[in-house]
A protein has these predicted regions:
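Flavin-dependent oxidoreductase catalytic cores
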Residues: 1-148, 152, 156-163, 167-168, ...
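Beta1-alpha1 glycine-rich phosphate/pyrophosphate-binding loop at the start
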Residues: 9, 147-214, 272-313, 324
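Redox-cofactor binding/interface segments in oxidoreductases and associated redox assembly factors
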Residues: 11, 77, 230-233, 270-271
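Short glycine-rich anion-binding loops that position phosphate/pyrophosphate groups of nucleotides
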Residues: 15, 235-238, 274
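Glycine/Thr-rich phosphate-binding loops of Rossmann-like dinucleotide-binding domains
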Residues: 19, 85, 112, 131, ...
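Short, contiguous acidic/charged loop-to-helix segments that flank catalytic cores in large enzymes
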Residues: 26-32, 134-145, 183-195, 254-260, ...
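A Rossmann-like FAD-binding core segment of flavoenzymes
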Residues: 194-239, 248-249, 255-259, 263-264, ...
């Protein structure tokens, strides 16, 4: 009855009425791509006006499939276009493989917006600064550049330098490019993070970067190759906070868990000093592997540093899994079977028995 009064109908699941509903305003990586297409199709069958659908549609192939199935007339792809504004043009000209796909991390788009910062994109840092960085002028003095490290920073630096006309060779010590992205994608419901590495490898290929794997950059290599410039992008190592440690209690870091280098026991206490997605992700992974897990966070709440919708989706998942969370917790020390924490507000001790 209302169709005659409407120009179109837009299907979206988000609502500000609840935290769980707000997650769907800008659905994060944990939610399946194009997850509202089927519901939109149900509406489309009974409507005679144009139908829009949004919700994690991040690839042109997905949008085309939705249209071909008659599930909608228009697909909303806001973050996908922030990540790659040229996506429609690339698709039209048969360059789908060159599209930089959004991974729905929410870190620099809606995450920046909620913090009062200009919108950007972790995969496209020129977003929001197009006047300065959209069109980088070609170099008038080409150099031979050696990039040490095949993580995101090294790959982006190599791609930009090569696109400007420099002769660039990137060296990676291991067999795979990606750096810590290779670890991040191993956390529950974070597999799409690996898309950042895929996209950057494509950028390097298009720019003409030479890639050498399984080769660590050392002084001898630099002296042999004699580049004009070396870009050091060798990454980082896991942070271990200072704490008192006696006895034989097993203590490992997140990298060791993700690389399957450690076999934790039945009862595990995850100490999260960053309040991001690593600690909760490790806790979730261990619970799903059958361990009894508690999570202690060095902040006011779990996911304190995360974008709001990522945080709340993660909080809901941890609650469903029944993972106990202790906030305001700083690691103080451990012995044979006890972990000692300090409440960061009261200063009082908190003791966890093994």
């Amino acid at each position: 009855a209302l169709q005659s009064q409407l120009d179109y109908l837009h299907i979206v699941a988000g609502t500000s009425a609840s935290l769980g509903g707000a997650v769907h305003i800008v659905p994060p990586m944990a939610i399946q791509p194009a997850y509202l297409a089927r519901e939109a199709g149900t509406f489309k069958q009974h409507l005679g006006i144009p139908l829009f659908v949004t919700g994690r549609i991040n690839q042109p192939q997905e949008a085309e499939l939705i249209l071909a199935r008659g599930q909608a007339d228009v697909c909303g792809m806001t973050r996908a276009l922030i990540c790659d504004p040229q996506m429609p043009n690339k698709t039209e000209h048969g360059q789908v493989e060159d599209v930089r796909a959004c991974i729905a991390c929410n870190q620099a788009c809606i995450g920046h917006f909620h913090r009062g910062l200009p919108i950007s994109c972790i995969q496209r840092p020129e977003t929001g600064r197009e006047l300065q960085y959209e069109q980088l002028p070609p170099t008038t003095r080409p150099k031979r550049i050696l990039v040490a490290g095949g993580g995101p920073a090294g790959m982006k630096a190599a791609a930009v330098a090569a696109a400007r006309g420099h002769q660039v060779t990137l060296y990676e010590a291991g067999p795979q490019l990606g750096g810590q992205v290779l670890l991040a994608q191993l956390l529950p419901r974070r597999s799409e993070f690996g898309g950042a590495s895929t996209n950057l490898q494509r950028e390097m290929a298009l720019a003409g970067v030479e890639v050498v794997r399984n080769t660590r950059v050392d002084r001898a290599l630099v002296e042999r190759e004699r580049p004009d410039l070396v870009i050091a992008a060798t990454g980082a190592t896991p942070y271990w906070p200072a704490f008192e440690r006696t006895g034989d209690l097993q203590v490992v870091d997140a990298w060791q868990i993700l690389r399957s280098e450690a076999k934790p026991g039945r009862s595990v206490l995850v100490i999260d000093w960053r309040c991001d997605w690593i600690g909760p992700g490790i806790a979730e992974r261990l619970v799903r592997d059958g361990h009894q897990v508690q999570l202690a966070v060095n902040g006011t709440h779990c996911g304190e540093s995360l974008p709001l919708y990522v945080r709340d989706q993660l909080a809901g998942e941890l609650h469903r899994l029944g993972i106990p969370i202790t906030p305001y917790a700083r690691l103080y020390g451990c012995d044979d079977n006890t972990v000692y924490l300090q409440h960061t507000a009261s200063g009082e001790p908190m003791i966890f028995e093994g």
